Amino acid sequence: MILVDYNQVMLASLFASIGNHTNVELDENLLRHMFLNSIRFNRKKFTAEYGEIVLCCDNKNVWRRDYYPYYKANRKKSRDDSDLDWNALFEIIHRIRAEIEEFFPYKVVSVDRCEADDIIATLCMEHGTELNTGSEKI
């Protein structure tokens, strides 16, 4: 199976489209297109060898904050300082995810209080899956 960190690929698609521009208006259709194009490319390239795509999704209120209260605290400050409307972006990401679950053949996995990385690590440990982070194999 091909395990994909949904939020990471979605954000990578966004930042690839906006580059270094500021005061960017979010384009939901472009973001959807870029994400699905990325998934289509990887599915076409790797499905024969590794199997089907599984989208692993982040959830709110992750368990790590119970142990590390400042987990990802710097990201909030960065988002507050950013021109990007992060609340609108997360709504778009959630809406596209719901569309994918309803209309596309991809499996979507979301676990309460877990991030995509937790899901990916668990599936790799349980199924002996080789993990390719995009830059290196683990």
PLM segments and residue spans:
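Noncatalytic, basic helical substrate-engagement surface that gates or grips nucleic-acid strands
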Residues: M1-S135
